[in-house]
Amino acid sequence: WLPRVAGSAATAAALCLLIFGVYLQPAVCQAIGIVPDAWMQDRYYRYYGVVTGFMTNLANLEIDKPDNYSEEAVDAILDNVDESRKFSTSPLYPTSYAATTAKDEQVKKPTIIYVMNESYWDVSELEQYGIKFDTDVSANLHALQQTSAYGRAYSPSFGGGTCDVEFEALTGYSVSFLPSGSKPYQQHVTKPMFALPSYLKTEGYQTAAVHCFWARYWSRDTAYPNLGLDDFISLEKMHGVQKVRRHYWTTGLVTDDSMADQIIGQYETMKAQSDAPVFLHAVTMQNHTNYNRDNYPDDERVHVVSHPVGLKSSTCLLYTSPS
């Protein structure tokens, strides 16, 4: 029986080498027409079958251990955090409730509405490089900056991968340690894990998410509960919303105005059901690609009136106002 066992083991090893060394290589998958569907796993399995879907996802599961990673190294970082707490900083708003009330006497907990505005950025920052517009392209943002605390955040993702940004924002974990091509919501958020919503629930918060696209995209419908989000209002549950900019993959993108109505409505529903403080995670869609010129009406376009020498006029002929 030993020869049979040895033969079976050799066959299994050769099969694994063929699958992981050849079949699952990106170039090979592309050559034979396998295009991993990072957006909807159920659709991917329907197109290519259980074996291909399982095997290609398997390649995205293993996370390499970082250099110098150990329990002692983590404890050293925590010691530094404890040491930093000895230093005091002045409150941003000296007359606020948190600044004027001792921590052990504080009973109020703020409403937290966490909005991730799809692809939004302050286009007016281009003016420092010599690009001038015929109007203030970030008028609403500039108005908010006059009355609110604000800062700068750098997105960990560019040109796609919305769920990567969400994952980092909600958990504080970096996707840079994950295998290339993996998506945390699909391969790694498969059971309850520490995240901002789950932590806030221990502090007495009620939690929900609002996103104006299909619930199954990026597997949000299964990932959100594991992050501590108890309710999820997706496009399937939205009625009478306004849409703009049709594409081949959608009948239109829900506008930010309609999204604001959905956020307000969900907040009011949660407050009517309970006196507990609210955490609401919202992700918009209006600014999503594609940015075809014919998808924007004339009254949404602004003109570039000057640009740096060497930059073609056609390159920066028209921009759409994010206001």
Residue ranges of predicted features:
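N-terminal secretory/membrane-targeting segments
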Residues: 1-109, 131-152, 185-190, 194
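Solvent-exposed soluble domains appended to multi-pass membrane proteins
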Residues: 92-108, 115-322
